[in-house]
């Protein structure tokens, strides 16, 4: 009797939600960055969309992918972080599998919820580094981990050493800069002790156009520091809105698109 019970009970065991065992595609950002850079090399005009905070809302994320795929004028998609709600491995895998249906390449920033449990490890396994940069046409995109509270301020978040390196190695073909982060300065998650220093770093890059962020599940356009630099906030995917940016040679346009 004991043997029978032991054998039948084996089927009841499931992987722990934080086991961090990743199946399927990895290094998504690296692979998609190569596609973006190759397709836009030498161009001075392009268009990208932004979505953010897709945690829990799998149906809405599926609908966003379908809406974006109906267009033929978008070059890539940026995700502002919080793919997961609890940092569980399966949440990242589910989101990756949905986003991989996009016809265009996409990249993901890390959100504060993505740090929970073993979330940061899984994010790195599937998507890659939490600070990274790439060049689309003549624009340098700098993607930052700004979730300082999740480290209890024990690590340099935002990472000014990374920013120093990016400025020192700024590509010759890049003429403008755009920043993407999950939490903006002033957020309870941001290290607001250095918010003014951070803004000066951002402004010190060549022709900084604007900053993008998510986190608060709202849509807004704010001049956070009163210096003319706009911060565009992308709402959570439950709002069924994505942001659309068209970069032109001498300017850019912005649109919030409902679907």
Residue positions per predicted region:
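Beta-strand-turn-beta hairpins that frame and shape the catalytic cleft
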Residues: 38-49, 133-143, 170-178, 224-230, ...
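N-terminal active-site segment of His-dependent metallophosphoesterases
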Residues: 10-94
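Core catalytic region of metal-dependent phosphoesterases/phosphodiesterases
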Residues: 61-136
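His/acidic metal-ligating clusters that form di-metal
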Residues: 69-76, 151-230
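Sec-dependent bacterial lipoprotein signal peptides
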Residues: 1-10
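Active-site glycine-centered loops adjacent to acidic/histidine catalytic or metal-binding residues
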Residues: 53, 81-82, 111-112, 182, ...
């Amino acid at each position: 009797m004991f043997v029978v019970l032991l054998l039948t009970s084996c089927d009841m065991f499931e992987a722990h939600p934080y086991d961090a065992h990743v199946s399927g595609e990895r290094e998504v950002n690296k692979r998609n960055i190569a596609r973006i850079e190759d397709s836009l090399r030498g161009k001075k005009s392009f268009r990208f969309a932004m979505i953010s905070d897709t945690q829990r809302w799998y149906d809405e994320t599926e609908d966003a992918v379908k809406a974006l795929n109906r267009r033929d004028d978008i070059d890539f998609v940026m995700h502002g972080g919080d793919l997961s709600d609890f940092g569980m491995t399966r949440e990242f895998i589910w989101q990756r599998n949905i986003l991989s249906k996009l016809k265009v390449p996409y990249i993901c920033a890390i959100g504060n919820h993505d740090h929970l449990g073993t979330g940061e490890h899984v994010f790195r396994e599937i998507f890659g580094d939490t600070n990274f940069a790439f060049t689309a046409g003549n624009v340098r995109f700098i993607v930052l981990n700004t979730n300082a509270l999740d480290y209890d301020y024990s690590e340099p978040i935002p990472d000014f050493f990374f920013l120093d390196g990016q400025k020192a190695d700024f590509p010759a073909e890049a003429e403008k800069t755009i920043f993407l982060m999950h939490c903006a300065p002033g957020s309870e998650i941001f290290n607001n002790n250095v918010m003014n220093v951070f803004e000066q770093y951002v402004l010190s890059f060549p022709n900084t156009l604007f900053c993008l962020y998510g986190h608060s599940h709202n849509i807004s356009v704010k001049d956070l520091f009163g210096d003319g630099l706009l911060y565009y906030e992308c709402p959570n995917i439950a709002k069924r809105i994505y942001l659309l940016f068209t970069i032109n040679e001498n300017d850019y346009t912005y649109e919030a698109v409902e679907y």
